[in-house]
Each structure stands twice: as C-alpha cells, then as structure tokens.
Amino acid sequence: MAVETIQKPETTTKRKIAPRYRVLLHNDDFNPMEYVVMVLMQTVPSLTQPQAVDIMMEAHTNGTGLVITCDIEPAEFYCEQLKSHGLEQQH
C-alpha cells in the first residue's frame, strides 16, 4: 500500500478593514456657541471641553468641523443625536 501526501494549496485570507466615517459639524447662525459645545460633549462622551470648543471654533471659522471619525453605526448615532439637538446643516 502506498501513502501519498497531498499538499493543500496556500491561500491567504485578507480581512477587509471597515471603512471609517466622519461626523461633521456645520456652522450655523442660530445656535449659541456654548450650546454647541454642551451638545458635543453630551453626544460624544469621549470629548473634553477643550476638544468640543476646538470643534465648534473650527466649524465657526471654516464652515465645518470634524467631530469624530468612527465606524458607521456610532457615526449614524452621533449624527442623529446632534440633529435631534438642532445641530444640522441649514439650507
């Protein structure tokens, strides 16, 4: 009886990296700056007050500010929370 070893062809499995989503804050002429900072800190618990102030000032100065970059589910949650507090892009 003969024994033969069959070699399995090498395959590499590459995991796709989940895309990251940016939550942006748009400047508006309606909400007071202090309110925007408070809402940012309530919505994104990892933000400190200086970070929230920086985001608000970036939006105020440049038109938009980057709130956070994250996976889609938290990004959608943060976006909805900000909108529910009146922080949404006005047309």
UniProtKB/Swiss-Prot annotation:
Pfam families recorded: ClpS
Lineage top rank: taxon: Bacteria
GO BP terms, alphabetized: protein catabolic process; proteolysis
SUPFAM superfamilies to which the protein is assigned, alphabetical: ClpS-like
Summary of the function given for this chain in its UniProt record: Involved in the modulation of the specificity of the ClpAP-mediated ATP-dependent protein degradation.
Record's subunit section: Binds to the N-terminal domain of the chaperone ClpA.
Family: Belongs to the ClpS family.
PANTHER family: ATP-DEPENDENT CLP PROTEASE ADAPTER PROTEIN CLPS, ATP-DEPENDENT CLP PROTEASE ADAPTER PROTEIN CLPS1, CHLOROPLASTIC
Protein name, per record: ATP-dependent Clp protease adapter protein ClpS
Species annotation: Synechococcus sp. (strain ATCC 27144 / PCC 6301 / SAUG 1402/1) (Anacystis nidulans)
Native organism taxonomy: Bacteria, Bacillati, Cyanobacteriota, Cyanophyceae, Synechococcales
Gene (UniProt): clpS
